């Protein structure tokens, strides 16, 4: 399952939409909720990002992300 993680690079200031960045993770999980939990744990263990949202990408959404060139799988 591919998850899109929306985050701010710092926890020191208030989140601003204009500064939101994304990363994509491939998580092996039984359910969507388990995948979100694993994604959050993985990111928080590696980097001190302020995570705003984690969403599971549907097949169509993933294809769109690949077509726009925004998709790049992140590995820790």
Swiss-Prot record:
GO cellular component, one term: DNA-directed RNA polymerase complex
One annotated GO molecular function: DNA-directed RNA polymerase activity
Name by which UniProt lists this protein: DNA-directed RNA polymerase subunit epsilon
Family: Belongs to the RNA polymerase subunit epsilon family.
Protein task: A non-essential component of RNA polymerase (RNAP).
EC number: 2.7.7.6
Residues annotated as transmembrane: none
Record flagged with keyword Signal: no
Subunit structure: RNAP is composed of a core of 2 alpha, a beta and a beta' subunit. The core is associated with a delta subunit, and at least one of epsilon or omega. When a sigma factor is associated with the core the holoenzyme is formed, which can initiate transcription.
Keywords per UniProt: DNA-directed RNA polymerase, Nucleotidyltransferase, Transcription, Transferase
Taxonomic placement: Bacteria, Bacillati, Bacillota, Bacilli, Lactobacillales
GO biological-process terms attached to the record: DNA-templated transcription
Taxonomic superkingdom: Bacteria
């Amino acid at each position: 399952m591919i998850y899109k993680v929306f985050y701010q690079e710092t926890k020191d200031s208030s989140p601003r939409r204009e500064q939101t960045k994304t990363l994509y993770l491939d998580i092996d999980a039984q359910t969507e909720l388990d995948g979100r939990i694993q994604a959050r744990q993985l990111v928080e263990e590696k980097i001190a990002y302020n995570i705003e949202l984690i969403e599971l990408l549907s097949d169509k959404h993933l294809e769109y992300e690949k077509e726009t060139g925004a998709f790049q799988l992140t590995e820790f």
